[in-house]
């Protein structure tokens, strides 16, 4: 069932003539985090989902993706240092919808994956706080933790305003094709197609953000781990391929070195050339140092030869970014 989502919302932010589109989108994205915080707080107290609030966020995501896909994806993949699980949920919804657009999902499917990804972690607010940030976690406590996606899924039961697949996305986003996921250990075709895509988005975002028991990881390394996991049968290969189309082999924010000696930071992906993103390159040999935007797809003589470390809060504090990554992390979100 397609829902005619509102064109105006609680998230509208007045824009001055000199404000850039990107700056406005960033402000509206922050507004979406605030609305989602209200949604989660209300769910924690009443165990009911206010879909009016949720649709505001999903509608804004759809508008941002249509308006400027690159900026929208950039907002979706910013490493998360605070406001978990609210901001993670907003980002997961946005990235899942970006992947859905690339995969040519129907309007119903886009709404379902956007809404299901947005609310799936609302149940984390019902999990005892003593269980969060603990690794390893005791088995009896793990049983409580892994039930969190079911809380939102149960709240969606019988809600005619939500597309039918929404509940599947919320309930199954942490399931894995090889049966290693939770809460039910579903395998293969038992996992809804949309949930498979949402799972890849959720996992990628979880990896590039720090968790209480580990630092953040370089986006490129997260992509590598997801590709490896897909090869082992944990993730849907079509969903992983779509992630690559959207964020590239070198995701937004990755530090890279080019074969001409310059270092750079990835700005945007090139859908048809996942190993040749658009980046901002820094020439340290130029006096003063020179910055240049470079589209590797239009510069065949240039290529990435090395990927660097992510300069995040974890690395500043001296933590080792080589901490093992789990693609089935309890705290991925």
State the predicted function of each range.
Residues 1, 22-29, 304-307:
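Generic hydrophobic, helix-prone segments enriched in Leu/Val/Ile
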Residues 6-33:
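Extended, charge-enriched "interface" segments that sit outside catalytic cores
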Residues 1-5, 253:
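N-terminal accessory interaction module
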Residues 4-7, 196:
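A composition-driven signal for long, intrinsically disordered, charge-rich low-complexity tracts
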């Amino acid at each position: 069932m397609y829902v005619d989502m509102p064109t105006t919302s609680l998230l509208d932010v007045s824009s001055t003539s000199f404000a850039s589109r990107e700056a406005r989108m960033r402000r509206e994205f922050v507004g979406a985090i605030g609305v989602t915080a209200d949604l989660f707080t209300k769910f924690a107290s009443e165990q009911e989902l206010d879909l009016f609030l949720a649709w505001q966020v999903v509608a804004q995501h759809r508008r941002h993706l249509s308006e400027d896909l690159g900026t929208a994806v950039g907002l979706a993949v910013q490493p998360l240092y605070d406001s978990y699980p609210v901001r993670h949920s907003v980002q997961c919804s946005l990235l899942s919808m970006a992947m859905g657009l690339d995969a040519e999902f129907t309007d119903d499917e886009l709404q379902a994956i956007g809404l299901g990804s947005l609310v799936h972690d609302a149940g984390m607010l019902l999990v005892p706080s003593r269980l969060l940030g603990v690794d390893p976690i005791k088995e009896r406590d793990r049983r409580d933790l892994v039930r969190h996606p079911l809380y939102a899924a149960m709240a969606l039961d019988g809600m005619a305003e939500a597309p039918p697949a929404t509940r599947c996305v919320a309930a199954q986003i942490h399931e894995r094709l090889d049966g290693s996921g939770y809460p039910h250990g579903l395998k293969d075709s038992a996992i809804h197609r949309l949930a498979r895509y949402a799972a890849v988005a959720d996992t990628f975002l979880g990896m590039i953000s720090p968790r209480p028991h580990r630092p953040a990881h370089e986006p490129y390394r997260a992509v590598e781990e997801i590709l490896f996991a897909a090869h082992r049968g944990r993730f849907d290969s079509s969903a992983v391929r779509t992630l690559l189309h959207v964020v590239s082999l070198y995701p937004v924010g990755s530090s890279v070195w080019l074969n001409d000696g310059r270092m750079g930071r990835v700005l945007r992906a090139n859908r048809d050339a996942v190993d040749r993103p658009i980046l901002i390159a820094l020439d340290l040999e130029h006096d003063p140092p020179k910055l240049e935007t470079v589209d590797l797809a239009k510069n065949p003589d240039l290529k990435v030869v090395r990927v660097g470390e992510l300069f995040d809060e974890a690395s500043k504090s001296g933590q080792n970014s080589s901490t093992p990554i789990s693609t089935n992390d309890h705290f991925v979100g």
